[in-house]
Amino acid sequence: MIIDTHIHLDDSRYNDDIDEVLNRAREGGVKRFIIPGAHPDTLERALEIVEANSDVYFAVGIHPYDMDGFDTLDFDMYVKHKKCVAIGECGLDYYRLEGTDEEKEAEKLRQKEVFIAQIELAKKHNKPLIVHIRDASRDSKKVILDNNAGEVGGVLHCYNADEELLSLANENFYFGIGGVLTFKNAKKLVNVLPKIPQDKLLIETDGPYLTPMP
């Protein structure tokens, strides 16, 4: 069975042609779709989509770029929905840190706090995690291990080819692979891929982002 484990169907760019997008994917053999959570503002749209399509599911979470919504989001209400299958996407992203060194460290600390809170939520509700990692492999791995995230496991969304993360396969984590694999600068990922157990690989598009190169 082909499952697109990460597609942002709640993105406004799909508003006008979502039925066409889903039908093309179905015709291509995709049987299930998972909408990751990223920001509270898109959750209601995600609910509309999953309730209208029996083969679409969703996750609830706060992306590290959208932490302002963390304190106001009623996680429990969404997690209890029958089609909520995961927590995330959540994690650490240091790629766009700005400001002084002190401000950057404060931002890292806040990201860790929000990530840990979502790990605890996942354990509370026995849901797997959708983990976002960018330029933060070492800290992300430490947070995952220190907080026993392997109890619920999950997927490392858009796996970044960092070999430091490979051992998380032993902690109940899978590796999400998508369009990045076709990019000209993906040689490292191509070389690392054979080191991942085949039963730990998941397919994702991350649509409408990361379109494969022709």
State each model region's role.
Residues M1-P214:
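Mid-domain alpha/beta scaffold segments of enzyme catalytic cores
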